[in-house]
Amino acid sequence: MIKDKVIIITGASSGIGEAAAKLLASKGAKVVLGARRTDKLEQIVDEIQKNGGEAIYQELDVTKQSENDAIVNLAREKFGRVDVIFLNAGLMPSSPVSALKTDEWHRMVDVNIKGVLNGVAAVLPVFIAQKSGHVIATSSVAGLKPYPNGAVYGGTKWFVRDFMEVLRMESAMEKTNIRTATIYPAAINTELLGTITDKGAAASMKETYDTYGISPDRIASVVAFAIDQPDDTTISEFTVGPANQPW
């Protein structure tokens, strides 16, 4: 059941995170939203509250362990527990390796990999103490197969896939009742394209998204479906994308 669950969402200021926040709040969840753009978070929380939902927010840079710890503490102080964390923050500045956009490589590692690690490190002690919890992470179809221009981005998303699967296995072995779900979106209309600075990669991705892109609401509904399963059931992976996109 989703109702009354306390759910932390990172990368919540737009796209998939925003859509998930609104949907889960409409189903009775208490959502705790984190992102760097607090003006956007304030607008989303205000809309949720006006519609009768419960939501709070805090500025969050997922690359900083202290800020991940702080949002978990906020959720516990306000609502008394944490039931789910949805690790959704991410960047996609795709480019060919030969472009040597090394600053972007390191930024993707910091956000897409370390952001997931920091979020899990912040919440895992709480979940272990509770003997319950649910970790959901956004990977990508680029975490399932290689694509030109996606060597580093795809590598970060392959990491998420492997890390989440091992977390699932270890949690089962340790009998902590911690569920996991990893989501592999294809062309979903979000602000990710805005992070691409390479002109060739940007043009190619824009054409793909203009042709196939679908609403982030589709991913939000999958997140809700995963959370809504009985506590003894894990659905560990979802690949979701446009019906006509040959990803």
Predicted segments with their positions:
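The beta1-alpha1 cofactor-binding region of Rossmann-like NAD(H)/NADP(H)-dependent oxidoreductases
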Residues: 38-39, 59-70, 102
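Conserved glycine-rich cofactor-binding loop
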Residues: 13-14
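Conserved glycine-rich Rossmann-like NAD(P)H-binding loop of the short-chain dehydrogenase/reductase
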Residues: 27-44
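Residue(s) in the substrate-gating loop at a strand-loop-helix junction
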Residues: 140
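Active-site helix of classical SDR
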Residues: 120, 156
